[in-house]
Amino acid sequence: MISARFSGRQGDFTLDAAFDVPGQGVTALFGPSGCGKTTVLRCMAGLTRLPGGHLVVNGVTWQEGRQITPPHRRAVGYVFQEASLFTHLSVRENLVYGLRRARGPLRISEAEVTQLLGIDPLLRRPTATLSGGERQRVAIGRALLSQPELLLMDEPLSALDRISRDEILPYLERLHASLQMPVILVSHDLSEVERLADTLVLMEAGRVRAAGPIAAMQADPNLPLIHRPDLAAVIEGVVIALDPAYGLSTLQVPGGRIVVPGNLGPIGARRRLRVPATDVSLGRHAPTDTTILNALPAVILGAEAAEGYQITVRLALGASGEGASLLARVSRKSFDLLGFQPGEQVVARLKAMALSAPAQTGG
């Protein structure tokens, strides 16, 4: 468990943020620019000191009021927006620098880091010859090799162009699946958060609006996320079948099975799906003579008005609503004509080609 409380003023900005999140997996601090995300991250690293603070990381106290463990005595890896590499050193020499800074036991080896981040071919190269995405991967590798108990990442993709972001995201997803250490990720990009985070801390104007599992936060009618035009549900599943003849994979998810384009193998691999709410339609019966491959039983939990004469319908997969959360954005007219009610069992139809899952980088 990570328990954090930080309060105080910095110039004209007042921070009063508190949250408790799991001591493993990826937690995203999400919110608009200037809401205090980076300030919280710097407090966790010990780089910013606010006397009204409290920080316990998996049973180890790093701050209790004015008793503050200095940064160099915290087992923290910090990845900045800009990859701050030593330009006079090679890639491998930058990584070795991280190893030399290690304070605790060996949690991850150089070989594991280079394999996870795909930087083996770069080891002999000068850092000046690297692309933006390659530089950031090396910076992450160096932070990991310092053997941290906590990895802090301050908008690690914000300085990259779209091509470089698309290059590095699959490697971050591999880290997410492989690392045991907790990661705190600062981001204002919801699509990035949906791909990487398990837990979401929603911040507004220096305060924490809410915190919890990302799927629950997306579907919470009391939070602003549910009103976003790019609303989507995040669903975790396990690959149970591959269909190479048609280029499809089948995932078992809580409450049903979903067919997805692409080879997401191997069998048994855990994958995360992003299901856009606008690509989910509802009916009372399973469709026939249709191109839609996914028709899953679901239960309506509730509905909220959305912009443009639309309705956002909150659902739970499964005949009894025992499965994963799902969201559908439908026209108000169709919703009223069909007379859907909370508690009613319906069939959720998902367009397979609209579903997206992480690209695989091998292994």
Swiss-Prot record:
It comes from the Bacteria. It catalyses: molybdate(out) + ATP + H2O = molybdate(in) + ADP + phosphate + H(+). Residues 1-230 form the ABC transporter domain. Keywords: ATP-binding, Cell inner membrane, Cell membrane, Membrane, Molybdenum, Nucleotide-binding, Translocase, Transport. Its main location: membrane. InterPro entries: AAA+_ATPase, ABC_transporter-like_ATP-bd, ABC_transporter-like_CS, Mo/tungstate-bd_C_term_dom, ModC_ABC_ATP-bd, Molybdenum_import_ModC, Mop_domain, P-loop_NTPase. ATP binds at G31, P32, S33, G34, C35, G36, K37, T38. GO terms for molecular function: ABC-type molybdate transporter activity; ATP binding; ATP hydrolysis activity. One of its GO terms (cellular component) is plasma membrane. Its EC number is 7.3.2.5. It is a peripheral membrane protein. Residues 289-359 form the Mop domain. It is found in: Cell inner membrane. Belongs to the ABC transporter superfamily. Molybdate importer (TC 3.A.1.8) family. The complex is composed of two ATP-binding proteins (ModC), two transmembrane proteins (ModB) and a solute-binding protein (ModA). Part of the ABC transporter complex ModABC involved in molybdenum import. Responsible for energy coupling to the transport system. This is Molybdenum import ATP-binding protein ModC. It comes from Rhodobacter capsulatus (Rhodopseudomonas capsulata).
